[in-house]
Amino acid sequence: MSQVSDTDKKFMMQALKLASCGLYTSYPNPAVGCVIVRDGKIIGRGYHHKAGCPHAEIMALQDASFDVEGATVYVTLEPCSHYGRTPPCALKLKELKVKRVVAAADDPNPKVNGKGFKILRDAGIEVTQHVLEKEALFQNRAFMKSITGPIPYVSVKVGMSLDGKTALKDGSSKWITGSESRQKVQDIRAKSDCIITGVNTVIADDPLMSVRYDELKEKYYKKIDKEYLRQPLKVILDTNSSLNITKYRIFKEGKVLLVHGTTDSELLGTEKVVNEHVTRIFMPLRHDLIDLEYLLKYLGELKIRRVMVEAGSILTTAFINSGFCDELYLFMSGKVLGKDGRNAFNLDNALSLDKCQEFTLYKTKKYGSDVLLHYLSGGN
């Protein structure tokens, strides 16, 4: 493998910045960025906008008017080698006689996974791998998990007081956190493929659970290709079929999957389209709640890559107790609600300190008067 230089890192960072634009629209594909460099100058830039659209390499080649002979291509993910909705990028780079390809991450997709690099090397093109690999893998962490297993990446968001409460005793919760935190939540929603919530949240808050793009900070909004804006699938866990779908706002726009629990094997997995917005499905129970593993595998079959959980204590606790939570976004305000407030969590007791579930603090950031604590599960 060629020596990784500061120059390689500099140009790969530019490719990663481009890739971040695709996090909002590239579903179910990974977010990929590419820059093409000749004589130390960038001559082409591109990122993958949406499934079925040209890949990042092709966008950058177009930007360079396909005049790239002898150039170096920096791309955040291994160039594809198979015919899907678009032709293989590796073959196009070979055809146009680029001199060198620098990649951040290998593609774990079995359809690619090393085959793109082989095409390039067999053509005499120099290949350098794993430049800023850690950053690239984290950027596409949802894709990396979901493409190699049956379960999507799960992000759990909690807004809470300084003393770990999500609401007053009477359920009042608007607003524990400030407007800047809520803007950031819109950004997380916009990067998610579905949002899961529970029946109690729907009844208490009557939320829309939609991405309010007009509330995104300009630095986020300007990245998005407005042509491909989308709304995540909304998944509501209504174990006992208690919700009246004509009463709540969440059922009046976008796509909603309403999940009911059942012990009847004949009902299990059956779906019914209720109207243009709502589909009902029956899923098995585990400990009197919807079986989360069954639910997540079902969503994985829909090619859902990233799940966001925005719910109350019961569902939030269930995701953490189950071990399916890959990351936690804890938005903590300076408010103190007191001992009678509703707890953010009601977790199982650890058997011992050396056997307890543990999350690693990835990042902290201040949003107005609030602080975001971003934790990753121990396996990430």
Give the residues covered by each predicted segment.
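Enzymes that bind and transform nitrogen-containing heteroaromatic metabolites
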Residues: 2-13, 18-23, 27-30, 45, ...
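N-terminal glycine-rich anion-binding loops that anchor highly charged ligand groups
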Residues: 26-40
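Proteins enriched for Cys/Gly/acidic motifs involved in redox and nucleic-acid/cofactor modification
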Residues: 24-26, 52, 117, 131-159
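Zn2+-dependent cytidine deaminase-like catalytic core
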Residues: 36-135, 252, 262, 320
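Short alpha-helix boundary/capping motifs
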Residues: 64, 121, 147-149, 327, ...
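Short capping loops/turns at secondary-structure boundaries
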Residues: 109, 113, 129-132, 147-151, ...
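Short low-complexity, flexible loop/linker segments enriched in glycine and/or proline
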Residues: 116-118, 142-145, 211-213, 324
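Alpha-helix capping at helix-to-loop junctions
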Residues: 122-126, 145, 149, 198
